[in-house]
Design a protein with these regions (language model features):
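Surface-exposed loop/turn elements that mediate protein-protein interactions on large endomembrane-trafficking
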Residues: 1-4, 23-45, 67-88, 108-126, ...
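Hydrophobic, glycine-enriched assembly/anchoring segments
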Residues: 131-154
Length: 154
């Protein structure tokens, strides 16, 4: 078998017909309902730090080895191609892939970028937020210990 020596710690469905598996050395994307077939098999030679996904994209975080940032987020489409690579230094709490947006945040910092990797915002929160989530358009829900705020990005 192709996966004889692979450990596959992560498996998820993007939609009814598309799923993916992340092994220690590869990303495999499957298509088809009843009998899924491998549509992409991407070999990876770096250790994956974490995995994020939505219905159309898969994000893999690696430690950056180029010195550009602490981390590198590679965002793959369902064909297994890297659509963008985003370098960042923030120790992230969560990464959200939503529509054409990438949101990387922790309690005190946030980075917003589009799927082309263009940063739209990179800054600090005045209030520590426990949760930061997109609502619609340029509006976001920010939940702190004291309040629930709506933030609008320009």
């Amino acid at each position: 078998s192709d996966y004889a020596n692979a450990v596959i710690p992560f498996l998820a469905f993007l939609d009814n017909d598309t799923s993916f598996a992340v092994a220690d050395n590869r990303l495999v994307i499957y298509g088809g309902g009843q009998r899924p077939k491998s549509v992409a098999d991407v070999l990876l030679n770096e250790e994956i730090q974490s995995v994020f996904y939505n219905s159309t994209h898969i994000g893999l975080v690696f430690l950056d080895t180029t010195g550009t940032g602490k981390y590198r987020l590679d965002v793959y489409n369902t064909s297994g191609q890297v659509e963008t690579s985003l370098f960042f230094d923030m120790d992230y709490k969560d990464i959200i892939l939503q529509n054409e947006n990438i949101i990387i945040y922790n309690e005190t910092q946030c980075l917003l970028a589009n799927m082309s990797g263009v940063e739209r915002f990179n800054g600090d929160f005045e209030t520590p937020y426990l949760l930061f989530s997109p609502i619609r358009g340029n509006r976001y829900l920010a939940v702190s210990q004291e309040s629930i705020d709506t933030i609008e990005m320009r």
